[in-house]
Amino acid sequence: MRIVFMVALAAALPFAAYADSAPTNQTAQAILDRVLANRPMKDFSLKARLFVGTEDPVPVEIFVKNTPGETRTLYRGRQTEALVVQPLHGEPKFYLRGVGELTGNQRTQKLLGSNFTYYDLGLAFLHWPNVKLLDEDRVRGRDCFAIEARADGEPYPRVELWIDKEYYALLRAEAFDTNDNLTRRFAVTSFKKIGDAWVPRGLEASRVPPAQSLPSEEKSRLEVYEGDYDTHLPVDWFATEKFHAESGGGRNGTD
């Protein structure tokens, strides 16, 4: 079975996973390297609905441009257009049409008012150097590696990851604040076959309010209903120059 995952957001970082025999005694870094290496080289596009609270769902289009050195993912919904540039090696960069590059706390702005932030879409924690293997676990009936990642100067100092042991795909991530309280959770909830590929049909992003715990959480959900896994997308759609700040204000991520 071939699986194409957009993790955490569902849109986050796309990658392809193939069943493979796993070497024994792997390190956490070796496992994450395999996750990052398992990505498609084809362009593809998806149509989805973003559910935020009790409001009507927001139509979202997701376009993915893959090259040997990086993945560029474009999100379009309402008046918002956001771009995530994820090098194969290195930190992701984030751009918002009419605003320009997002840096610092700007990276944690919400996509269309949801609990999916731009920072989450880049899955930067997959690149953090301080990682360790915690144990083996199960998520939605799948055997997983449980991995802890830590980093200084990031929105979350600690993240726990659950990686599917067969397909080397991220199925769940939980982020913790400086007091080691669970603050965010991302999960793949279901899958859909598009052509010869399987993609996440449902993805959830949950925010846990301060001093509270699960299930007292605020959820947003992205549901994919259509896609084209073998398409050719225009290069200029993904040019960072198109996202420069506009004088007098521009679009924002909560339109």
For the regions a protein language model found, what residue spans apply to each?
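A short, Trp-centered hydrophobic/proline-enriched beta-strand micro-motif
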Residues: 38-55
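Flexible, processing/modification-adjacent segments and terminal tails
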Residues: 20-33, 37-42, 87-158, 165, ...
